[in-house]
A protein has these predicted regions:
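C-terminal (or distal) subdomains of carbohydrate-active enzymes
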Residues: 1-400
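N-terminal/edge-of-domain interface segments
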Residues: 394-573, 578
Length: 578
């Protein structure tokens, strides 16, 4: 608790692609869980008993449901360092096999183990330790009422070691010559390390199921992608890679230096459960988002779901508005490697029409549907894209703001097509916005901006011009899309008798960047992006790939009686604030 604010943890039940409303009330006593326990160096819930050794590594995980041990006898699930990590050709991109063939060293400096949480919903052990100049903090957690079959290991690492590879090792009490690796769309089975394939990619999970299929261990992670399998019973996840190099790319000797936050999790299961691994991996990587809202009746009730699949064989990867505004686009795929027939994706309203599309939302043919359900059939790991049009809801809620455009006297051509980018430029580098990316209208935060026409005057270059605000009604907010041309600027906007200052970043470049120790400083723009282009035009280079372009959203109060604004802008709208 901090002042009049408190952090609380509770078990929530939320439907797929939906929300649930909970209210918080003071209670006379503290809720207790009979399942959660945290005696010395031990965690226990209704599913697992987890024991740490004196070094803070996980020496035992007992699955009480199946009566199985997850950790190989005499071993531990742990982080380990591999010292001597040379690479002189492509240090950031390669790891040498001789590095990984060395025995890993434990991280055992200055070990401190304490209880961080012991509540009715979650119990957590905190492990602090060091390796040379690098500092490690781990939080090992079990829950009661949440994802209780998942053991989370959250990590914060302040890393400054050199010539070292850091991995998490999982020597399991199950063994198999092959493991299943998540590819994002499906999975692949791979064997143990070879001379040429010893560091392989996976997305959110890797599963090792015993050769007899009786029991398995799934390792989840939220941001790491390199794995290896040195033995039938061992998985390893690459965490940090700081190579030594005497020749090329010498600055990469400090690769990965800095503070890192990552989580890996352990799930035990009976049988071969790759579809459960998919669900668990998604749950770790897309946790519930909680926020506080004022009490109100609302239109949709205390719970709502935008869609739900009838079987875990169908994974929904995206639900979005169609690019042309006509209906919704659903992207899904078959998850298990077995064809599926007649699966259903159900929506909250009746489907009026449905069609199968390709990846760029072009029609392929009609799709089957019944009532509120889209009928899906797919081959092994096959991706599918559908467009669905839903019946109008009885109650429509909108985030749109009632806005009106401000008339501008355009005096510069900022958006060009491929045929004209050599004729019109906006900066000394001879660049321009790529018109093929700019729609007729841009919507941001519920405000719609009407964009100018390409290859003609379509923007205003600041020169102290005064622009009249709409006079048909009283407006309370001014919304502006603006960018700086040659360098970031502090711009002045005079709205009526009130003056505002706004930081306007450059129209191109990077919005943010990690810092590289001893080489560059990290940064992130503070302005809100109103429009983002994935490439731009430049006279000598043509279409510049990954040459991002931006227009930033600025918002100002309109004082009572204001009729004009003097500003630097590309386009603007005056609007009521709802």
């Amino acid at each position: 608790r901090e002042g009049d604010q408190a952090r609380i943890l509770f078990a929530a039940d939320v439907k797929a692609a939906g929300y649930a409303v909970y209210d918080v009330r003071p209670a006379s006593g503290v809720a207790k869980s009979s399942a959660l326990k945290a005696p010395e160096r031990t965690l226990e819930n209704r599913i697992y008993r987890v024991e740490l050794d004196a070094n803070g590594d996980i020496r035992s995980i007992r699955d009480k449901r199946a009566g199985r041990e997850l950790v190989a006898e005499g071993k531990a699930f742990r982080m380990a360092v591999f010292e001597g990590n040379p690479s002189n050709r492509y240090p950031a991109w390669e790891i040498m096999k001789e590095t990984m063939d060395k025995p890993g060293r434990p991280i055992d400096g200055d070990v401190r183990i304490s209880i961080a949480e012991q509540g009715p919903v979650r119990a957590t052990l905190k492990v602090e330790r060091s390796y040379g100049p690098s500092k490690f903090v781990q939080y090992v957690s079990l829950t009661d009422g949440g994802d209780d079959d998942r053991i989370d290991v959250r990590n914060t690492v302040d890393w400054s070691s050199r010539d070292v590879l850091l991995k998490a090792e999982f020597p399991c009490a199950v063994a198999n010559a092959k493991a299943a690796y998540d590819l994002g769309l499906g999975f692949i089975e791979r064997g143990n390390n070879t001379e040429t394939a010893y560091e392989v990619p996976a997305q959110k999970w890797v599963d090792l199921t015993d050769a007899d299929g009786s029991y398995g261990v799934t390792i989840l992670n939220d941001c790491k992608y390199g794995w290896d399998k040195p033995a039938d019973n061992t998985l390893r996840l690459t965490l940090l890679h700081t190579p030594s190099t005497e020749k090329r790319y010498a600055h990469q000797r400090t690769l990965d230096h800095g503070v890192h936050h990552y989580t890996y999790s352990i799930v035990g299961h009976t049988g071969a459960r790759t579809e459960d691994a998919l669900v668990a991996g998604e749950a770790l990587n897309m946790p519930l988002v909680a926020f506080v809202a004022p009490k109100h009746a609302g239109h949709l009730g205390r719970t709502f779901s935008m869609l739900a699949a009838s079987t875990p064989q169908i994974g929904v990867r995206a639900l979005k508005a169609a690019e042309d505004g006509d209906g919704y686009i659903v992207r899904c795929y078959e998850t298990t490697g077995n064809p599926v027939e007649g699966a259903r994706i159900t929506f909250p309203a009746a489907i009026v029409s449905a069609e199968e599309c390709n990846g760029i939302e072009e029609r392929i043919g009609d799709a089957a549907f019944e009532g509120r359900s889209l009928v899906v059939s797919a081959g092994k790991f096959a991706p599918k894209t559908y467009r669905v049009r839903l019946a109008e809801p009885a109650v429509r809620s909108t985030l749109a703001i009632d806005n009106a455009p401000v008339k501008l006297d355009y005096d510069i051509t900022a958006y060009t097509t491929d045929e004209f980018f050599t004729y019109y430029t906006i900066d000394k580098a001879l660049g321009s916005f790529a018109a093929e990316l700019i729609p007729a209208t841009v919507e941001c935060d519920g405000v719609t901006f009407a964009m100018g026409e390409a290859n003609t005057d379509d923007a205003v270059l600041c020169n102290g011009q005064t622009v009249a605000l709409p006079a048909d009604r009283t407006y309370t907010k001014l919304y502006v899309l603006a960018s700086a041309v040659e360098e970031p600027r502090t711009a002045e906007f005079r709205v009526g008798d009130r003056t505002y200052e706004a930081e306007v970043p450059l129209w191109k470049g990077f919005y943010g960047q990690w810092g590289w120790y001893g080489n560059s400083e990290g940064f992130m723009q503070r302005a809100k992006i109103g429009y983002l282009g994935t490439h731009r035009h430049q006279t000598d280079l043509g279409n510049v790939p990954y040459g991002f372009s931006y227009m930033y959203l600025l918002t100002f109060d309109i004082p009572e009686g204001a009729t004009t604004v003097t500003c630097l802008l590309y386009t603007s709208d005056a609007a009521d604030e709802l």
